[in-house]
Amino acid sequence: AANDGKKKYGYYESEEKIIENMYNATGLERGIRHPAVYLMEAADDITYIGDDIEDGVKKGYIDIDTEYERLKKRYKSQQKNFFISCDNYFEQINEKMSKSDQLNAKARYFRNTIQGYLINKAKEEFLNNYECIMSGDYGNVALLERDSNMKSFIGELKGITGRNCFGCREVLALELVGHKVITGLLDILVPAVLRKDCNYEDTKQYEGKIANIISSNYIYIAKQDYNYESKDDPMDEKTRKLEELSDYEKIHLVVDFVSGMTDSYAMNLYQELMGIKLPYQ
């Protein structure tokens, strides 16, 4: 589906009817965000901001002392309570711990403190604008980005990871491997499910072998005809054969299957299908 210039895409065209039912059930109008979206969006940012910085320190990519001082120099007057808390704790561990232990302790405390601080800020913003949010008038801005100072602070926190981690060899190598695995799986699965005049239940055929690799849960969902409405029983479902799906639906099935894989499962399946390793190894 088109994203209308937004940062994230919405939903598949095939899910239009499901989304329409959701709008009707919740009473939302198109373009109006559900109140829970603001909280989920804030929770996602808060979690990853703190965790990514801590991981970067542990792997040796981020110098917590340098980045903290840079952050404090720019934002101390705006986020005073946060920096007072960190300063007091950092001073204590500088006196009690070795240099190597200090880094992990500071990173852990920084993560916990910044997450707690941002949770309170998001909660405060939500409660202060509760009526506006519930009426759908708050707009598409994130809870932690409505205030320009807080938006700048959030951007700088994300920038710590961006400057120090995203360009390092380990991250780039993982991205390249991920690209190879995902495109490799799609190159194998998509042509097989698009093959015409084949029996997907016949595992003697190549296409049948591929179809049986795809999780039965995804196949079950793909085979449901959500446009079918029974006159006798609204809960009645119409199940189709895999061969009866359109090309769009078949590709949709493969994309759902691949996107639902864990990293390790995707890697193992790719290696098995490419003949790099045997399934029972």
What are the residue ranges of the model-derived segments?
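Divalent metal-coordination and catalytic microenvironments
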Residues: 44, 182, 258
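Intrinsically disordered or highly flexible coil/loop and linker segments, enriched in small
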Residues: 28-34, 45-59, 124-136, 163-174, ...
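Glycine- and acidic
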Residues: 24-35, 99-105, 161-171, 247-255
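Polyanionic (Asp/Glu-rich) segments that form extended negatively charged tracts
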Residues: 78-140, 197-202, 209, 218, ...
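Sequence-structural signature of the catalytic-core scaffold of metal-dependent phosphohydrolases
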Residues: 1-108, 119
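C-terminal amphipathic alpha-helical interaction region
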Residues: 203-272, 276
